Amino acid sequence: MHPKRKKRLLIVLAGLAVVAVASGLILNAFRSNLVFFHTPTEIAAGQVDTDRVIRVGGLVEAGSVEREPGGLRVRFVITDTARSVPVRYEGILPDLFREGHGTVVQGRIGTDGVLAATQVLAKHDENYMPPEAADAIQRAGETVVQ
């Protein structure tokens, strides 16, 4: 094999090796940062790893919200109407957080089966529309109708 051709081949192989290693590192980073969504039924059935950060969605069970007096600690239960998951959270809850309403909680399941939440997201009704948007649509409708 000609020395120039051999050198080119080595450079191409080295480049491919670098691309392969970089691709492997990127895929590994993506996999470790994925947050999977689960239901309370899946958690109760033991289908969830306790060492991963997960998201759990459902309704806040009526009568389950317990706030620590003078503190930010809250305990509540999320249900999908079939099974329930107890949640522990320390922080300020969203304004739309209410019993009987939808919520998505992110955190880790402890060995005791309680979800230690790091983030609580309150879901609003799919028919909800901010007042400003409703006013704008109404004004647009009036100008079109005229």
Curated annotation (Swiss-Prot):
It is found in: Cell inner membrane. GO terms for molecular function: heme binding; metal ion binding. It is a single-pass type II membrane protein. GO terms for biological process: cytochrome complex assembly. It holds the Pfam family CcmE. It comes from the Bacteria. GO terms for cellular component: plasma membrane. Keywords: Cell inner membrane, Cell membrane, Cytochrome c-type biogenesis, Heme, Iron, Membrane, Metal-binding, Signal-anchor, Transmembrane, Transmembrane helix. Heme binds at residues 124, 128. The chain crosses the membrane at residues 9-29. Its main location: membrane. Residues 30-146 are periplasmic. Residues 1-8 are cytoplasmic. Heme chaperone required for the biogenesis of c-type cytochromes. Transiently binds heme delivered by CcmC and transfers the heme to apo-cytochromes in a process facilitated by CcmF and CcmH. NCBIfam families: PRK13254.1-1, PRK13254.1-3, PRK13254.1-5. Belongs to the CcmE/CycJ family. This is Cytochrome c-type biogenesis protein CcmE.
